[in-house]
Amino acid sequence: ADEAQWQEVANQALARFGKIHMVVNNAGVGGDIGPIENQDKKGWQWALDVNLMGVVYGAKIMTPLIKEHGEGGWIVNVASMAGIGGGPYLGAYTATKAAVVALSESWAGELEDKGIHVSVLCPAFVQTRIHESERNRPAKYKSGSAHTPDEGSFTNSTKQMVDNGIEVSIVGRRVVEALEDGEFYIFTHPNYHPVMQERNAAIDAAFI
């Protein structure tokens, strides 16, 4: 979530590899979890700065470096199934991941004629350490949000689903496969397809 740090990463990558052809914007914190009225500005700002602005800075810094050599490249933004269809108590997380999906769609159209492909990865539950992100929350983002009993139950259930999710290596292989096939949307959990079909059907019906 720091533009200067992204510039340092770019400098290190150029020093090591000479050119940059691909960037994977992978950042995710849960933000405050709970009812709308319990989520304060600091929790929202944390999610916005990491989940959204981290992606923005990554593309802003790296895209000119990919354009510079004229050989084309790829930007992969990591969103979430939550960014396609939000769940309860996860307002900040779902909003920022939805923004990543929308940004990816925008950038894909913008960069296509520059030879730069854009893809957006939307996984569901994966065995990551996202629930440990709270301990790394900087002091300036510490909030006073109170946890409700319902929220605590929801948090515990989502942690269990993360712990029982697919392995990261499976996601990695899926991404490689998708890039080889030139896919824009990258999904890792086929069992969510019916949920997406239902959502899309509701949207289609609203246009009638």
Which sequence ranges carry the predicted segments?
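Alpha-helical segment proximal to the catalytic Tyr-Lys
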Residues: P64, G109-E112
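Active-site loop immediately N-terminal to the catalytic Tyr-X3-Lys motif
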Residues: E37, G87-G91
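The beta1-alpha1 cofactor-binding region of Rossmann-like NAD(H)/NADP(H)-dependent oxidoreductases
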Residues: A1-E8, K41
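Substrate-binding pocket helix/loop in short-chain dehydrogenase/reductase
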Residues: G34-I36, D40-Q45
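Active-site helix of classical SDR
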Residues: A59, T96
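SDR active-site lid
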Residues: D113-I186
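Residue(s) in the substrate-gating loop at a strand-loop-helix junction
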Residues: S80
